[in-house]
Amino acid sequence: MKNELCLPAVFDEKVKAYAQIFTKFNKVHSLSNYKDISEQVLDSIKPLEIFDLSAKTAIDVGSGAGFPAIFLALAMPQTKWHLFEPIAKKSSFLSYAKIELGLQNLEVHSQKIELADKFTADLITSRALSKTKELIKICEGFYDENTKFLIYKGSSVMEEISGIDAQIYNEKNRNYIYFNLKNQGEIR
């Protein structure tokens, strides 16, 4: 289940640049309560060691300050990332970070995913947005039976994913939930 993590040569440099941008914006706009983003960066990219996340097109729902999407986009430059964030100060920050980090594989959508034009993604990620089944519902039109979902969840997740055949990897207080909807039947 472990994959060797092979990050692009510029990854650490870009993370440092992101940290500076984040610190500057966070003082004014209160994007997040994180003071040190090191653990959040590691949490964001940990699934790359665990699951096969290869994708041509990926969506992150409720991107907030960019965890995990910015770091997955840095680590997966071959993937086109679509970040959906309806809160203006956060989507503005994400757009600024995209430009400053030179992330040409990333597009910021300043809207709720439910209101966006539909397209099919290979991978859909989300962290701390909503219950898993609610996330599946709001993403209708963006997935097919082959689309993989990667959901970052806290420690109590089993009831939330009942009825979903998923791989679950636990580390500390984090559960990484990975699944697709092939042969799942209707999820309620």
Swiss-Prot record:
GO MF entries: rRNA (guanine-N7-)-methyltransferase activity
Cellular location(s): Cytoplasm
E.C. no: 2.1.1.170
Keyword Transferase: yes
Sites where the protein binds S-adenosyl-L-methionine: 62, 67, 113-114, 127
Domain of life of the source: Bacteria
Reaction(s) this enzyme catalyzes, per UniProt: guanosine(527) in 16S rRNA + S-adenosyl-L-methionine = N(7)-methylguanosine(527) in 16S rRNA + S-adenosyl-L-homocysteine
Record flagged with keyword rRNA processing: yes
Keywords: Cytoplasm, Methyltransferase, rRNA processing, S-adenosyl-L-methionine, Transferase
CC annotations in GO: cytosol
Gene3D superfamilies: Vaccinia Virus protein VP39
EC top class named in words: transferase
Family matches, as PANTHER family: S-ADENOSYL-L-METHIONINE-DEPENDENT METHYLTRANSFERASES SUPERFAMILY PROTEIN
Family of the protein in this entry: Belongs to the methyltransferase superfamily. RNA methyltransferase RsmG family.
Record's function text: Specifically methylates the N7 position of guanine in position 527 of 16S rRNA.
Protein name in the entry: Ribosomal RNA small subunit methyltransferase G
Gene: rsmG
